[in-house]
């Protein structure tokens, strides 16, 4: 089978088979353009080797709802009760530096073990979801399908005529309310 080769054409001249070239991509029938660079980039990209952004460490804005506490949010002096300017500057510096270094120290000591624990937790969660939850749900849906058909037949056989008859009997009932003074 030539797969759509014209006279004089060789199969080596094409990036993809002539059948796909003439007929289009099998997944998108009328798409004759197959960009192999994009396909290779998508298939070669590995999530374990991607670079992380050290500047924007919350690209999905996961912590936007978390309270961001600055010095001005915690300590404020109302008008007329100001401390010395030097004390105010020293307090600001002490608060900011202490918060900064305590956070860094805590993340250095506890961050890596917690990252390990959360990595294990989400790996287990993914494993359970992929290998237990989804197959159980799919099995349940397959098994319940035959029961739902029997249930549907019973409802249409027994309940539908009963409720249609009740609807016809009670459909003519009219209620009139009047207010007596």
Curated annotation (Swiss-Prot):
Please provide one cellular component term from the Gene Ontology annotations of this protein: Golgi membrane
Which keywords are on file for this protein?
Cell membrane, Golgi apparatus, Lipoprotein, Membrane, Palmitate
Looking up Pfam families in the UniProt record yields: Caveolin
Q: According to the Swiss-Prot or TrEMBL entry, at which residues is a lipid covalently attached (S-palmitoyl cysteine)?
A: 136, 146, 159
Span-the-membrane segments of this chain are none
Question: How does the UniProt record describe the way this protein sits in the membrane?
Answer: Peripheral membrane protein
Molecular function as annotated in GO: molecular adaptor activity; protein kinase binding; transmembrane transporter binding
* PANTHER family in UniProt: CAVEOLIN (PTHR10844), CAVEOLIN-1 (PTHR10844:SF18)
Q: What does this protein do?
A: May act as a positive regulator of T-cell coactivation. May act as a scaffolding protein within caveolar membranes. Interacts directly with G-protein alpha subunits and can functionally regulate their activity.
Q: Mind telling me what this protein is named?
A: Caveolin-1
